[in-house]
């Protein structure tokens, strides 16, 4: 039987979030609704999840000693990584000492870089993937591009939100792609993956939740990427029964191999009825923000339940829905969001502003959510709302 204590009391049920971005913020809110005491950690102060947590700490989570000291100080019941840039070797040690890492330290370690998860998927599980090479230097990079062929995709093995990712469409872009990959890695320059360019009909996120009663699947989420970063998503994505069955089978195989409890974002390419594995995140997925409009229990609420060992009897979809990321470009630490009365004037429209303190370049600062009778209308509604938003830097 699962029990939950009282926050800020000796019997509190404590969760430590490692990473405090917009996805972590929603998880913190859901955990607090269940009476959980939450500690939010990030590498910079006043990150979104830190703004709604009971306590916040700012450290380099790649510093194993600092991470261990913080865990030993707080003694959380659950450690929940929300980003890739973490000292995963320390998490493995902490798990061996009895701490509960969500979903598992192994899952966090394997998925913190693209090499670990790609080798698990392709070489151990035999899942279909794009052709790939891993390289450490410019000379090997040029050779890998020659072997894979142009066009090809280049990504740092450790990055997120499209940072350091590019598509090589001609030979004169090889040096530029290498330089960009070295600037965009979460832990600095270094190893990259060169992937063959996949021709696909569409791509989906198959959100999969492993919980106390087994494994459940959310309706597939379609999405559009730009520069390797999510811009729009919608749920459900129309697909054949066979393709959906294969997507769920692929998702179950990879999440079973990773183990533990929680939500996983399994990224897949779909070509006809064929499924090609791309990546997996052992945490809520940015494209899954649409579930805040589409489902009775969002991906964040499902993650909170799974972490705590609470039952998930059914995943119920309220309505077709869409999301559109609010991406701002410029430089400011004093942003203002205006014209909200117009943004929210249509029924079934909502907005989430993440509370990020600054932008320097381009940054996702919020998301528009919309419901309608089908995903096409929901997406059009979200785009209309987005067009009315005025962001002043």
UniProtKB/Swiss-Prot annotation:
Residues binding Mg(2+): 267, 279
EC number from the UniProt entry: 6.3.1.21
Catalytic activity of the protein: N(1)-(5-phospho-beta-D-ribosyl)glycinamide + formate + ATP = N(2)-formyl-N(1)-(5-phospho-beta-D-ribosyl)glycinamide + ADP + phosphate + H(+)
Keyword Zinc among UniProt keywords: no
Listed InterPro entries: ATP-grasp (IPR011761), ATP-grasp_carboxylate-amine (IPR003135), ATP_grasp_subdomain_1 (IPR013815), PreATP-grasp_dom_sf (IPR016185), PurT (IPR005862), PurT/PurK_preATP-grasp (IPR054350), PurT_C (IPR048740)
Binding site for ATP: 114, 155, 160-165, 195-198, 203
GO terms for biological process, alphabetical: 'de novo' IMP biosynthetic process
Gene Ontology molecular function, alphabetical: ATP binding; magnesium ion binding; phosphoribosylglycinamide formyltransferase 2 activity; phosphoribosylglycinamide formyltransferase activity
Residue numbers binding N(1)-(5-phospho-beta-D-ribosyl)glycinamide: 22-23, 82, 286, 356, 363-364
Subunit structure, interactors included: Homodimer.
Role, per record: Involved in the de novo purine biosynthesis. Catalyzes the transfer of formate to 5-phospho-ribosyl-glycinamide (GAR), producing 5-phospho-ribosyl-N-formylglycinamide (FGAR). Formate is provided by PurU via hydrolysis of 10-formyl-tetrahydrofolate.
Similarity comment text for this entry: Belongs to the PurK/PurT family.
Name of the protein in question: Formate-dependent phosphoribosylglycinamide formyltransferase
UniProt organism field: Actinobacillus pleuropneumoniae serotype 5b (strain L20)
């Amino acid at each position: 039987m699962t029990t939950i204590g009282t926050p800020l009391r000796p019997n509190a049920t404590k969760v430590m979030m490692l990473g405090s971005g917009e996805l972590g913020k929603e998880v913190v809110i859901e955990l607090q609704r269940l009476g959980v005491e939450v500690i939010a950690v990030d590498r910079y102060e006043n990150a979104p999840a830190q703004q709604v947590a009971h306590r916040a700490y700012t450290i380099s989570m790649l510093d194993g000693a600092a991470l261990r000291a913080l865990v030993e100080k707080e003694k959380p019941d659950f450690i929940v990584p929300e980003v890739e840039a973490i000292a995963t070797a320390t998490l493995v040690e902490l798990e061996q000492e009895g701490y509960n890492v969500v979903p598992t330290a192994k899952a966090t370690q394997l998925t913190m870089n693209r090499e670990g998860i790609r080798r698990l998927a392709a070489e151990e599980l035999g899942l279909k993937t794009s052709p790939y090479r891993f390289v450490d230097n410019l000379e090997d990079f040029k050779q890998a591009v020659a072997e894979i062929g142009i066009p090809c995709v280049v990504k740092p093995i450790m990055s997120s939100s499209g940072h350091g990712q590019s598509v090589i469409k001609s030979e004169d872009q090889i040096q530029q792609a290498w330089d960009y990959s070295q600037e965009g890695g979460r832990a600095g320059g270094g190893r990259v993956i060169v992937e063959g360019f996949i021709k696909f009909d569409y791509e989906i996120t198959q959100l999969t939740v492993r919980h106390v009663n087994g494994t459940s699947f959310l309706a597939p989420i379609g999405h559009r990427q730009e520069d390797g970063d999510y811009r729009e998503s919608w749920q459900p994505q129309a697909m054949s029964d066979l393709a959906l069955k294969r997507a769920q089978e692929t998702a179950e195989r990879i999440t079973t191999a990773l183990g533990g409890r929680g939500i996983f974002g399994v990224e897949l390419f779909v070509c006809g009825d064929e499924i090609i594995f791309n990546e997996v995140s052992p945490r809520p997925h940015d494209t899954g923000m649409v579930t805040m409009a589409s489902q009775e229990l969002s991906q964040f609420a499902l993650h909170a339940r799974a972490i705590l060992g609470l039952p998930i009897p059914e995943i119920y979809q309220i309505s077709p829905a869409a999301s559109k990321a609010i991406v701002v470009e410029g430089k400011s630490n004093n942003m203002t969001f205006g014209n909200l009365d117009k943004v929210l004037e249509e029924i079934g429209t909502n907005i989430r502003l993440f509370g990020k303190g600054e932008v320097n370049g381009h940054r996702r600062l919020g998301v528009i959510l919309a419901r309608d009778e089908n995903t096409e209308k929901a997406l059009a509604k979200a785009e209309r709302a987005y067009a009315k938003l005025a962001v002043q830097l």
